[in-house]
Curated annotation (Swiss-Prot):
InterPro entries assigned to the protein according to its UniProt record, in alphabetical order: ApaH, Calcineurin-like_PHP_ApaH, Metallo-depent_PP-like
Lineage: Bacteria, Pseudomonadati, Pseudomonadota, Gammaproteobacteria, Vibrionales
EC number: 3.6.1.41
Catalytic reactions of this protein: P(1),P(4)-bis(5'-adenosyl) tetraphosphate + H2O = 2 ADP + 2 H(+)
Keyword Hydrolase belongs to the record: yes
GO MF entries: bis(5'-nucleosyl)-tetraphosphatase (symmetrical) activity
Protein name: Bis(5'-nucleosyl)-tetraphosphatase, symmetrical
Superkingdom of origin: Bacteria
Hydrolase in keyword set: yes
Class of enzymatic activity (EC top level): hydrolase
SUPFAM superfamilies: Metallo-dependent phosphatases
Family membership: Belongs to the Ap4A hydrolase family.
Length: 268
């Protein structure tokens, strides 16, 4: 059995199929972990949702910011972005089934040796806090209050974690950390604006969330996507897998057992 983790697909279905074919992926013996943003600007978001859903227990998925946006659009709470190629999802006969399945996916998935989320884990959280925060918001996403949360989650504030946060402030921070975070200010506040590669950031105010000096160390490796400008990032405890396939880059997948990387250049 092999465990494969893949970065942001964003509807780049054909590239995903090429990667899985290359490693002879077997639903009977292997597992595919997907680091969020299954849908958005790529040409085959509908096919991607259907395929990943069809994998059943052979797939582990976490929600990304584009996945949450798709759910918000489905409730009429947000407009579809011009660059998103998600209209076929809303025209599909199985749209309700697909969207219901998507809403049941977690913000944080855990393996014996690693955890996976879309953007990262707040530098102020230890692993147990991250688990608890994820479960708090997942209960809402998977319940009757989902439309309320989707309507009210869009905000860059609060930008600093405090365990005394309550209600929407607490949920917004948790969602932003798991699905939108890239840089932090030196005091730990989240920056929601800068998308540059770290080497292009001048000054010492902005630091990648995983390089913040006072970040709480985690006992497991964190695998994440979201940050295409990193073009992949690997160290002992952090692995970034988004290499911008939807932007003309590549789709990257890692086999956990031997840490071998597999890449597929964008086909379109």
């Amino acid at each position: 059995m092999a465990t494969y983790i893949v970065g942001d697909i964003q509807g780049c279905f054909d590239e995903l199929q090429q990667l899985l074919k290359r490693v002879n992926f077997s639903t009977q013996h292997d597992q595919l972990w997907l680091a969020g943003d299954l849908v958005a600007r790529g040409p085959k978001s509908l096919e991607t949702l259907r395929f990943v859903k069809s994998l059943g227990d052979s797939a582990k998925v976490v929600l990304g910011n584009h996945d949450l946006h798709l759910l918000a659009v489905s409730y009429g709470l947000k407009k579809r972005k011009d660059k998103d190629k998600t209209t076929p999802i809303f025209l599909a006969k199985d749209r309700e089934e697909l969207l219901s399945w998507l809403a049941k996916q977690p913000l944080l998935a855990e393996h014996d040796e690693f955890v996976m989320c879309h953007a990262g884990i707040s530098p102020q959280w230890d692993l147990e806090t991250a688990r608890q925060c994820a479960r708090e918001v997942e209960r809402i996403i998977q319940g009757e209050e989902l439309p309320w949360l989707l309507k009210n989650m869009y905000s860059n504030l609060p930008d600093l974690w405090d365990d005394s946060l309550e209600g929407l402030d607490r949920y917004r921070y948790i969602i932003n950390a798991f699905t939108r975070m890239r840089f932090c200010f030196s005091d730990g506040r989240l920056d929601m604006d800068c998308k540059l590669p770290p080497q292009e950031v001048t000054g010492d105010q902005l630091v990648p969330w995983f390089e913040l000096p006072h970040r709480i160390p985690l006992e497991k490796t964190v695998l994440f996507g979201h940050w295409a400008a990193l073009q992949g990032y690997i160290d002992e405890k952090v692995i970034g897998l988004d290499t911008g396939c939807v932007w003309g880059g590549s789709l990257t997948m890692i086999r956990w057992e031997d840490k071998q990387l597999f890449t597929q250049d964008a086909l379109d």
